[in-house]
Amino acid sequence: MKITLKKLLILAIVPFLYACSSDRANYDDVFAKDTHGLDLLTGQFSQNIDQIWGVNELLVASRKDYVKYNDSYYTRSHISFDEGMITIETLADVNRLHSAIVHTLLMGSDAKGIDLFASGDTPISSRPFLVGQVVNNFGQSITNVNVANNFATYLIQNKLQQRRLNNGRTVQFVSIQMIANHVNIRARKYLPFVRKASRQYGIDESLILGIMQTESSFNPYAISYANAIGLMQVVPHSAGRDIFKMKGRSGQPSKSYLFDPAKNVDAGTSYLWLLRNEYLAGIQNPTSMRYAMISAYNSGAGAVLRVFSDDPDEAIYIINRMQPEQVYRILTTGHPSAQARNYLVKVDKAQRSYRRVR
């Protein structure tokens, strides 16, 4: 995800300062006192990239994009989980490129403790996250250092490309296409968590999977400028607080908590339970309820009900007088948020593709 505006970088980093604070009451004071520090932090990060890579070359991790810098920001890895493309590039020598290829191919799925804004290699894992999603030049899965080293050597010798930056520097890079069904491979990694949450909260597995695909494309490192974290993109200070309250816990989930795949799937699914059983309770038709839940997961239950009426009870009454097709049409055309309108379409389509997953 290439970003050209410094403001978006600030939006990406601010929430992590917020998420690291367990005391929301003190957040505004802390933020006010540390404005200068925040400016230094965001300014330093963007300045590092601008000075090294030049303007309009800033890459930042997002919901469906893994981005990691290393080698003092001279080398970076980018995985587009939506497009199924891995690009690893360097302004240093090919030895640094080789190392980055190996570390990227063998990175694990545990995002806890990984600072995506710092420079440094992601640790090599004995259970690489990309196994099954990428194959080498012999069509083999890349499961260990030896296989990864050999593939990295092959890529550099046979697939190395170059491009010139606006600042005159030359980038050396390789691109690796993921296999055609990489999304389904990732989805299956999380089926045990999905099935457990489905049983516990009575939420259809296909709905959980459809939301996960739409929110993160099953990227365990997923983050967003809105401070949504992890596979189901749970926002700690809003949905996260509601979830903890439901579980009888105070405060909100931490960044580390939400980067745990099992806990994230549980949190996202429990929020769907809250939407169905509390915030949207009273909607009678199961299909209409599903449409409302999906839209509310993105924009909030209040925003969904206001599409039909400013009075929540009247909104539910109106929904109950409609056919599900009418509810769907109104939510996908009448919701004031274009993102919410598109979200329902995307999740509904994705959910249909998972109804036969076993």
Swiss-Prot record:
It is found in: Cell outer membrane. The keyword Membrane applies. Pfam families: Mltc_N, SLT. It is an enzyme of class 4 (lyase). One of its GO terms (molecular function) is peptidoglycan lytic transglycosylase activity. Residues 1-19 form the signal peptide. SUPFAM superfamilies: Lysozyme-like. InterPro entries: Lysozyme-like_dom_sf (IPR023346), Murein_transglycosylaseC (IPR023664), Murein_transglycosylaseC_N (IPR024570), Transglyc_AS (IPR000189), Transglycosylase_SLT_dom_1 (IPR008258). GO terms for cellular component: cell outer membrane. Keywords: Cell outer membrane, Cell wall biogenesis/degradation, Lipoprotein, Lyase, Membrane, Palmitate, Signal. The keyword Membrane applies. GO terms for biological process: cell wall macromolecule catabolic process; cell wall organization; peptidoglycan metabolic process. It comes from the Bacteria. Its EC number is 4.2.2.n1. Its main location: membrane. It catalyses: Exolytic cleavage of the (1->4)-beta-glycosidic linkage between N-acetylmuramic acid (MurNAc) and N-acetylglucosamine (GlcNAc) residues in peptidoglycan, from either the reducing or the non-reducing ends of the peptidoglycan chains, with concomitant formation of a 1,6-anhydrobond in the MurNAc residue. It is a lipid-anchor. HAMAP family: MltC. Belongs to the transglycosylase Slt family. Murein-degrading enzyme. May play a role in recycling of muropeptides during cell elongation and/or cell division. This is Membrane-bound lytic murein transglycosylase C. The gene is mltC.
